Regions:
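Short coil/turn segments that connect the beta-strands within blades of beta-propeller domains
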Residues: 86-87, 135-136, 207-208, 247-248, ...
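Bacterial signal peptide processing site
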Residues: 22-25
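C-terminal motif of bacterial Sec signal peptides marking the signal peptidase cleavage site
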Residues: 17-20
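Blade/loop signatures of beta-propeller domains
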Residues: 49-69, 75-112, 314
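WD40 beta-propeller blade core
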Residues: 148, 220, 260, 305, ...
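Short loop/turn segments that connect beta-strands within beta-propeller blades
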Residues: 151-154, 223-226, 263-267, 309-312, ...
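Extracytoplasmic beta-rich repeat domains
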Residues: 112-132, 160-204, 229-246, 269-291, ...
């Protein structure tokens, strides 16, 4: 009987305590302010900040730190190094350091020729690899792993090479016939073994060899004049980045963030470094940067790591990530282009909204700006130019990151409704002009001293890849795999 009474009294006391908790001043408000989904309290709404309605859109920049033009450096203080005519553009970013500086081109541009190089972007593959040129030939990679060599003057096709694998070398699942299994019993160990799609990879040319990486999980070395395969190495992992060739080695990053160093003569794997695995990444063709005995690579995780080219030992590492509130884009920290190295500075951009400069030797962070990009920063002397993900082109000081000018290009086809976003690739220098390409099929040139638009003209196709320049000729690869030459 006593036990039953005790249970009864305990129940009454518990109910009274819970009831009183809901009436204690401040507790209800505190709980409401913690809950980010509560819309019933005005104080809670104020704490959450601006909330998007059915017709409202909140800029990501409202949720993060914004860029501001510096009062210390004025556009008239910009001094560029002398322009020069570069003979070649042998790898992604122009050279192994991704820093070709102030490349030259004179006068207004006219189309020289336009050639189809294969299949454009489709559900099985994407055109992500920029063209490269050794000065005589220009090389392309289409959306179906077809490599084409053309004459830079006429655009005439000289040879083709299709990246393909034997059944046992496949990296993705599909159908393999009984006959193939009988011919190669070891293929039973490889699953069903057919690649249905291939995204990623790129090309680089050096010392008479064209190096090819692909989403099929194969790296090849070709004779750059004939297209003959000299060597191939199967990585079993799809390759994401374009190759970087320097000092007898070829560097590339796989889909699972593994950095490979290959022997440029034989294709033998010298060493590998495994970064943090990150499944989400942008559809671009980044590449590691190499200067002297140091290779610097960015990864989809936002990691930026410097290693010794000889053995892959880590010299220093850092990470680029958005410091603002979490947004869908800010959660993707992919360094989607690659680092740029010049004069002891390493500069890299993550698409999540960060651009930072580091000391090449120590890895110490020098400055950071809230500027996200899918493109390589463009260095010229003491200044950095960047095409941001929101359509802004900016000029910054290389030494301290001060923003000198900001130019907002058209961000959407329908500005009022914020529909059909426009992206920009580049920039590159064409003499005393910056040039960017629009995903809506336009080339735009800007004044590098203040960002004003000088000219714009139609290209003849949508473009998502940065243009390249050699011998004062600009080459543009469209999303439909058409290569267009302007001079």
């Amino acid at each position: 009987m006593k036990i039953k009474l005790m249970k009864y009294y305990f129940s009454i006391i518990s109910v009274l305590i819970l009831t009183s908790c809901s009436t204690i001043s401040g507790i209800g408000d505190a709980v409401g302010s913690i809950n980010p989904f509560d819309r019933s309290d005005e104080k809670s709404k104020a704490a959450q900040g601006k909330v998007a309605g059915d017709t409202d859109r909140i800029s990501i920049l409202e949720l993060n730190e914004t860029l501001k033009e510096s009062e210390n450096i004025k556009p008239e203080q910009i001094v560029l190094p002398p322009a020069y005519s570069n003979v070649s553009w042998p790898q992604v970013g122009g050279n192994a350091a991704h820093a070709l500086q102030h490349t030259d081109a004179k006068g207004s541009f006219r189309k020289l020729w336009s050639k189809s190089t294969g299949k454009g972007s489709n559900r099985k593959g994407r055109v992500v690899a920029p063209p490269v040129t050794d000065g005589g030939y220009i090389y392309t990679m289409d959306g179906n792993n077809l490599i084409t060599a053309m004459d830079v003057i006429s655009g005439n096709k000289l040879w083709k090479y299709k990246v393909a694998l034997t059944e046992r070398q496949r990296t993705r699942k599909g159908r393999v016939g009984v006959i193939e299994r009988v011919r190669d019993p070891l293929s039973l160990l490889d699953g069903s073994g057919t690649d249905k799609e291939s995204v990623g990879g790129g090309i680089a040319v050096e010392n008479g060899k064209l190096f090819v990486t692909s989403g099929l999980g194969v790296v090849s070395g070709l004779d750059s004049k004939t297209g003959e395969e000299i060597w191939r190495t199967v990585t079993r992992t799809p390759m994401h980045s374009a190759p970087t060739s320097a000092g007898g080695r070829v560097f590339a990053v796989s889909d699972d963030n593994e950095l490979f160093a290959f022997n440029a003569e034989t294709g033998e794997v010298i060493w590998t470094y495994q970064g943090i695995v990150e499944s989400a990444r942008m559809l671009t063709a980044p590449s590691p940067a190499v200067v002297g005995d140091t290779v610097i690579s960015g990864f989809a995780s936002g990691e930026l790591i410097a290693l010794r080219v000889q053995n892959g030992s880590v010299l220093w590492q850092d990470a680029l990530s958005s410091a603002g509130q979490l947004t869908p884009l800010a959660s993707l920290n992919d360094i989607a282009s690659g680092p740029v190295v010049d004069d002891g500075y390493v500069i890299a951009s993550a698409q999540s909204g960060v651009t930072s400069a580091f000391d090449l030797r120590t890895g110490q962070r020098i400055w950071t700006q809230p500027a996200g990009s899918l493109n390589f920063p463009l260095l010229a002397g003491d200044f950095v130019y960047l095409a941001m993900t929101d359509g802004r082109i900016i000029c910054m000081s290389k030494t301290d990151g001060s923003v000198i000018w900001i130019k907002q290009l058209r961000s959407h086809k329908n500005i009022k409704k914020k529909k059909k976003r426009i992206s920009y690739s580049g920039p590159i220098f064409v003499g005393e002009r910056l040039m960017v390409m629009s995903s809506r099929g336009k080339a735009i040139t800007l004044n590098p001293y203040d960002g004003t638009i000088i000219d714009e003209f139609k290209i003849g196709g949508n473009v998502f890849i940065a243009p390249v320049i050699a011998n004062e000729t600009v080459f543009v690869m469209t999303n439909s795999a058409k290569l267009i030459a302007f001079r």
